[in-house]
């Protein structure tokens, strides 16, 4: 995949993800992990995640980026509003804090790119796909875990 296509794909997925997260949706949709896992696979398949001329620095940058992606996925998961309706079905919806967390994620990613460029590290676009994919996987898993801990609806009282 060429660099421009990878960037376009990352931006499209980012826009779709933010749009979907800001809408009321059921928790635990079966396909919630499909797109993020595809992003990770595409990013890894591109290869060249490590600059051979600056291997140690590029590995540290990539590792730092992935750690931040995981942390920000968790942060976004905890900004989501989760509730049960009267029938007991779990729902979730993003809040303004979710948008703020996305802005921080984008700015952080840009910061890693700027740090790499200033150090002379040749950056490939595969890492952006892995960053967003991993962050979305962590967020989806954490939202489901939070939802499972949500108290079940009160049992109906049976009158004798």
Where are these regions (language model features)?
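Short, highly charged, low-complexity non-transmembrane loops/tails of multi-pass membrane proteins
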Residues: 149-160
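Cytoplasmic-side transmembrane-helix entry/capping segments in multi-pass membrane proteins
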Residues: 26-40, 59-64, 88-97
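C-terminal ends of transmembrane helices
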Residues: 14-28, 75-90, 142-146
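Hydrophobic alpha-helical transmembrane segments in multi-pass integral membrane proteins
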Residues: 43-57, 102-118
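Alpha-helical transmembrane-segment detector that highlights a single hydrophobic TM helix
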Residues: 54-82, 93
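Structural signature of hydrophobic alpha-helical transmembrane segments
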Residues: 1-11, 59-71, 100, 125-133
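N-terminal signal-anchor transmembrane alpha-helix
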Residues: 1-53
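Mid-bilayer segments of alpha-helical transmembrane spans in multi-pass integral membrane proteins
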Residues: 70-75, 98-115, 136
